[in-house]
Amino acid sequence: MKEEVKGIPVRVALRCRPLVPKEISEGCQMCLSFVPGETQVVVGTDKSFTYDFVFDPCTEQEEVFNKAVAPLIKGIFKGYNATVLAYGQTGSGKTYSMGGAYTAEQENEPTVGIIPRVIQLLFKEIDKKSDFEFTLKVSYLEIYNEEILDLLCPSREKAQINIREDPKEGIKIVGLTEKTVLVALDTVSCLEQGNNSRTVASTAMNSQSSRSHAIFTISIEQRKKSDKNCSFRSKLHLVDLAGSERQKKTKAEGDRLKEGININRGLLCLGNVISALGDDKKGSFVPYRDSKLTRLLQDSLGGNSHTLMIACVSPADSNLEETLSTLRYADRARKIKNKPIVNIDPHTAELNHLKQQVQQLQVLLLQAHGGTLPGSINAEPSENLQSLMEKNQSLVEENEKLSRCLSKAAGQTAQMLERIILTEQVNEKLNAKLEELRQHVACKLDLQKLVETLEDQELKENVEIICNLQQLITQLSDETVACTAAAIDTAVEEEAQVETSPETSRSSDAFTTQHALHQAQMSKEVVELNNALALKEALVRKMTQNDNQLQPIQFQYQDNIKNLELEVINLQKEKEELVRELQTAKKNVNQAKLSEHRHKLLQELEGQIADLKKKLNEQSKLLKLKESTERTVSKLNQEIWMMKNQRVQLMRQMKEDAEKFRQWKQKKDKEVIQLKERDRKRQYELLKLERNFQKQSSVLRRKTEEAAAANKRLKDALQKQREVTDKRKETQSHGKEGIAARVRNWLGNEIEVMVSTEEAKRHLNDLLEDRKILAQDVVQLKEKKESRENPPPKLRKCTFSLSEVHGQVLESEDCITKQIESLETEMELRSAQIADLQQKLLDAESEDRPKQCWENIATILEAKCALKYLIGELVSSKIHVTKLENSLRQSKASCADMQKMLFEEQNHFSEIETELQAELVRMEQQHQEKVLYLVSQLQESQMAEKQLEKSASEKEQQLVSTLQCQDEELEKMREVCEQNQQLLQENEIIKQKLILLQVASRQKHLPNDTLLSPDSSFEYIPPKPKPSRVKEKFLEQSMDIEDLKYCSEHSVNEHEDGDGDGDSDEGDDEEWKPTKLVKVSRKNIQGCSCKGWCGNKQCGCRKQKSDCGVDCSCDPTKCRNRQQGKDSLGTVEQTQDSEGSFKLEDPTEVTPGLSFFNPVCATPNSKILKEMCDMEQVLSKKTAPAPSPFDLPESKHGATEYQQNKPPGKKKKRALASNTSFFSGCSPIEEEAH
């Protein structure tokens, strides 16, 4: 009897998974926020939902199980049904939470799901309840394309599985496999078997997407050991639903599309059931029969069960719509009321009911008689919890130990796989050789017998030779078998070493991981095939052995059967004879005793016949059994052959996969080698990325503006809707006037809101796509930056050095960093716009809006007005669409024309480009010809320069020869000058003598006008003789060619300026004349005391070769040894008279060290200046030769100073002598007549 309890709501747990790498790479943001310490989640900014449990992305599996699922297990042992239901979008973590992909290797991992944890907790509780007997059965089914498939059926064929409803037991599934389990390991193996058989495929949103709804059911029956009539039955349904999906996001095609349609259909029916159960306003009808999923979950939703719904959601803002839908369905599920009851056995329930009636009657009876009710009626014996806990602990330890042993044995089995196969092959070869050896041995025995019987000696010798050869063959066979076994052991050891050696390098590629998993799966299949093959071979071997043993028995039985049949025939004949004799004996009374004897004999014969027939039947049965055994053996041999073929195919496939993996590895190595070429193109790619980024920026800017406009329109539409709502409330208060206008305004606003909402959705999708593209660009740029920071090893071994690579990285790293920052800024902007639009859509699409949409139309008149307005809008929109289609066709036609024109222009441009290419080639040819011509001209100019240099050298040689001639002439002129000086000295001596004689005789005086005539054109004063013994005590000064040119130019200017410029010229001469250091003697300190004009050596100052100064007592007006305004330094004055001639003063007044022919006393003529200019041009290219010993002292000294002060590389100049006489530029000297 079922005991009803008060209805309890379905408990809902919300679980949010973290962002997956794909969503992070697309730049998705969290659209859910969790309130700490509260079971509340907020969508967007202000839309919140509250559930029984809320688990954020950081929550572990153990916490989810302990808080939400573990309390349901305690109710199972009280007789209540329980259901755990995982609901949500595809890829939201339902299978992960439920443990639908559990394997034995994940036993102690923290990521184990709910189903394995439920199994462990169930058996722990069972171990604690030692006073109960438990019977557990498990079943596993899936609903694939609206068909129920049994996951525990080994054949995986479509069995006849039907759904039936029992009034007492609820929903039952007829034809479903139920396996009895005793320990947790058996239950886990059933779960793993079902998981391996479940339909899983890959989509664009989930690489391991469940394509079916799966239900794992554990049925528990418990009985008290002390009271067999007290029993409870309960069921635990663990449901892993397939996720709802959109074809646009999953990109499903073919079978995947069909599966997705059926999944969405079943979930739609489930949503309708949840809505019907959660809405109190609707009728009592719930559409359970719309799908098989809702039919199977009929007891879990609104029936006899404690139900927990785990709503799994994705936090990415790109899945906000699906997440919001899941949250709304979960919120509706909280309103569902279940009525769980304790499931008791019907007979036990009836018995308990009768006991309750008896107790009630006893209570009434005692109350009637004034008695009391004993208080120990409902007392129950206590349980020994301590012993149960100790037993549970020991079982847990034993379970862990067995698990470790199992894992170790599995590893050893995997390593011995190849050895087993090779050993079997060698075993087969050895068996074949063993048969051959047995034949050889039999032949050998026959030969030995033949040798014994033979008498001919030659035949005996031949037979002995054959025997020796047989022995040799046997020895060689044994050696071959030993070598083969050794080779097999060596190969297996090498393979084991290779398998057990640690991996030196791990590839992060998914292909490598997939290859390893595939190899492991195939190895597992081979192990299973080997196990099955070994069992069947052992069975065949045993049956063959039994057949071989039964073979002689069969022949014996056949003989016995024949003999028995003959005996039966004989005995039948004897029996017939005895029957006839008995019939005759009955007629004869005297033969009564004989007839009794015969009658006994007849009975004995009948007994023998019956025994023989019984033996005959038994032997016939044995023969039939042998025939069936032979058929079984042949069938097993065929299966063994097929399994061996399958194993060979698996091994071949494993080798092919290994070869493919090796080829893939080689391909990857080639790609690594090609990194050098790719690195050279990165600069171009960077420029291309910059251009694309600019284009994308412009496009994204435009889309941002469009999204902002759509957002504004949506906001305006919502504002208008609020205003219309307010106006409608006001008009309702005033009356029912203007119904048509009100309905028209309301429908217009609704349509505008819907259109704005759809536009906002479209812009939202565009923004999501834009952010995805931006995120991909950021990932690519970051990968490029990392690859530039860490160049591959192959690249470091290239021709260019690592420093050059680092330089290239530094050049483009700043640009890449700036691009990444700008893209991240754009992503943040897109995320803010997405969040804003999503919030607006959440406000516009409230949960109650579909209900409130048509509440404004309450009468037929309002409905007619609405239909009339909608029909009018439809007609106008159709007309507008027709106009747009016409304009579109025209635009397409014009576009086609433009494309045609564009094609023609492109052809024209291609022709022009061809012509320009030809022109470019022609211009290139002309350029090359000009270059060749210029090269030839350059060669000719080089030849001409060489010739000019040759002619210049020849001219230089001529000038050098001319200089030598001039040097020779100067030497001759020097000799003439010396002779002239000697003559002048003699003349001076004679004049002095003459003057002395005149003074002495006082007969003749020198005429003053002769000596002091200022108007004389030229007055000659004989030079003072220069004795060769006198040592020069004055510093020599030289004059270079530049000073000589300056003096000549200055003297020419004096000719042009006239006599009035003499003072200034005199001052200029003092500037360039070097200062002479004069050694003043003691005799000349007081000056001279001449009375005349100080014109001869009688003057002390002139004798000391110095000028008269202030200390002299001579008359300054008469003294000719004075210079006005000058120091006492000897100079050579240069004056010019009215006729343009020069006057040379007494050479004795010249500073010591200067010769008589110092060029400062005369101005060179124009011919000398011309020759000097020509020589200067020549000397600018060639260094002047060493000065001759006949050069003037001043010239030598000036050249020395110039050479010390000239810059490096400047050629030294020298003074050139004229080809004419030295005095060609001077006026002739007139001698004084005595």
UniProtKB/Swiss-Prot annotation:
InterPro entries: Kinesin-like_fam, Kinesin_motor_CS, Kinesin_motor_dom, Kinesin_motor_dom_sf, P-loop_NTPase, Tesmin/TSO1-like_CXC. Residues 494-513, 712-737, 1007-1030, 1052-1076, 1122-1143, 1183-1234 are annotated as: Disordered. GO terms for molecular function: ATP binding; DNA binding; iron-sulfur cluster binding; metal ion binding; microtubule binding; microtubule motor activity. Residues 350-999 form a coiled coil. Residues 1000-1234 are annotated as: Globular. It comes from the Eukaryota. The modification Phosphoserine is found at S394, S801, S951, S1001, S1013, S1017, S1028, S1128, S1188, S1227. CDD domains: KISc_KIF4. Iron-sulfur (Fe-S) cluster binding motor protein that has a role in chromosome segregation during mitosis. Translocates PRC1 to the plus ends of interdigitating spindle microtubules during the metaphase to anaphase transition, an essential step for the formation of an organized central spindle midzone and midbody and for successful cytokinesis. May play a role in mitotic chromosomal positioning and bipolar spindle stabilization. This is Chromosome-associated kinesin KIF4B. The gene is KIF4B.
